[in-house]
Amino acid sequence: MKLLTLKFFILLVVLFIPNTVNSKELNGLKNLVIYEDQKKISEISFKNEKDNDVSLSDYENKLLILNFWATWCEPCKEEMPSLQNLQNNSKFKNLKILPINIGQEDKNSIKKFFSDVNINTFEIFYDTDVKLAKKFSLRGIPTSILINKDGYEFAKVIGSINFEDPKFVNWLLNYD
């Protein structure tokens, strides 16, 4: 019995220690994971509404939030207005939010979605071949990847949050 208990304890340590060593959460925002070891992002590209390639290097020296979403995703629909309000927050000088659709939906469906939730700030971006979703190991949507001005992924929001939450806004201002 002692051997079984010891094996179980070791399994728990192996499963949970790596997650606590490499990341932490901002108190009160359960879906935000902050990396202690930031990850350098290699050059990536995706498509805009005009089907042109867009590259992260197009946004040098910007604090980026890549928000992965789809029109059929209810949590995406709920958080999108708070993302728009964050983008429009005058406290941020270098913030750029890029909502990237991974639902393989046509432009008209996306425009209707934006209209239905009163979104008028954002451009339309696509990850039609889901390369970015794979690169960032997305497990579901919405997921937002936060990239600092030096091109390092420093946090991830897994699921939805209120991007207008004062705790989140004040924390994010440190990176602007």
Language model feature labels by segment:
Residues 78-117, 128-134:
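Structural microenvironment flanking redox-active thiols in thiol-disulfide oxidoreductases
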Residues 112-120, 127-173:
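Thiol/disulfide oxidoreductase modules built on the thioredoxin-like
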Residues 7-16:
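Bacterial N-terminal signal peptides
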Residues 59-62, 92, 119-121, 138:
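Active-site acidic short loop of glycosyltransferases
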Residues 19-43:
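N-proximal helix/coil linker or "cap" segments that precede and/or mark the start of modular domains
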Residues 60, 68-84:
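Conserved redox-active cysteine motifs that mediate thiol-disulfide chemistry
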